[in-house]
Amino acid sequence: MHHSLLERYLSDGTAADQGRALAIVPHLRQDDLVLRDLGYLRLESLRQIEAQDAWSLSRLSKGVDVSLEADAQAPALGLVEHFPRDYPDESVIDLSVFIGHERVPCRLLAYRLPDHVVQERRRKALEEARKKGRKLSQEYRDWLSFGLYITNVTQQVWPPKVVGTVYRLRWQVE
């Protein structure tokens, strides 16, 4: 840790976090770790963090395309269909993937969540959808069965079970 305040920025509470996603790049040093929540997920920031020889860890946003191939023509993977079909008994799935239309390489980790956690996530999502006059798709309900993370930290540095633990530390840092 640098142990110093590098930047202070006040914004409208309704401003999107993505607009600030690149602000950290000039401050990065080799081997720094950038922990991000969904609001800061921008593919360009992931590229620039890696270009600085730094590390990133973020949750995966549902709308981001994921592919097993770097080819831009390769189809996006339907994760909620892929995992049960190809990894029916795995509690943690660890894959090298390419994300977004730009096919940014990264490591995807999917943790199957315990039933009680899945039920609570679905209950909250259903409540939120009702408030907005929407319905939850089955695909989104299935998505809520997993904790999904993307990182550029290799498996040799962080074994699969470590990634979720490190991400949870984010709340202790903030």
PLM region descriptions:
Residues 1-173:
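Single, function-defining residue in the core of a domain
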